[in-house]
Structure formats: structure tokens, C-alpha cells
Amino acid sequence: MWTTFIPDLLVAVFGAGLTVLIAFLTFRHQLKVTERVELNRLISDLNLRRVLHEITDPRLVHGAKDIDDFKHANLSVLDIREHTKRVGHHLRPNSPAQEPVSGLIKGCNRYLEAGMYEPEKYHFHPQELRSEVQACINKIAAGDDRIKPLDPGSSAY
């Protein structure tokens, strides 16, 4: 019995170490898969947003604060910002997607601020946001070939 104690102990320690390593690698893989799923959902949501659909003839709209479309656009951007924040909670530490996801939130903040100060230009502000969103989507997709870079607002209609 004592003649095999050291080899048995080594095998047990090696097996335990291997188990911990496999569990750690599985955990890391699951984090990456969850991140990818959340990013794809976010991009799909952005693809369906009417507020991000390209406006071919933007114009000044006087009295925009009283128009329902202006209010709906702001609510949509608020929803985009909140959805993006929730996705940010699913990102891995040091994920390459953290910077573009933060950029999406900042773009939404800029849109909302611009709409507050220049509501009559609310046809122009979504186009600026759309450009920022497209750049962020491209950065996110560049880091992972399983993330589809859909155009924001292109499937809204």
C-alpha cells in the first residue's frame, strides 16, 4: 500500500489540477460566448431601430418638441442607451468590445443633448448618431468574425 502512495498522490493532484484547468477554460469560453450572443442581439436591435434609419432628405422641423415623432425618437435612443448599458455588464474584463460599447452610450448621450438644445434639427441628429453607431458596430465586428456587422436602421422598414 505505501509503495504506491506517492504515485497515487501525484495522479490525484494532477487530476485535480486538470479538473480545475478544464473548469476555468470552460468558464472563460462561456463568458466569451455570452458576450458574443449579447453583442449580436444588440446589433440586431440597432438594425431594426427606426430612429437609425437613413433619412434621405433631412430638414429643419420647427416646433419639433411638440411632435410625437421627436418624442418617439428620443425614447428610442434612451432605450438603445439602456440596452447598451445592459450589454456592457455582460462584457468580459478587458474585452475589445468595451470601447465601442462605451462609444455607443456616448453617442446616445450626445444625441439626447443635441436634441435638447436644437430640437428643430432632429432630422440631422439621428444621422450623426447613425454614423457613430455604424463605426462602433464595425469595431465590435472586427474583433470577432462570428459577430455580424448589420447596418443600423436598415431593417426598420
Spans of model-derived segments:
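Membrane-embedded hydrophobic alpha-helical segments
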Residues: M1-L31
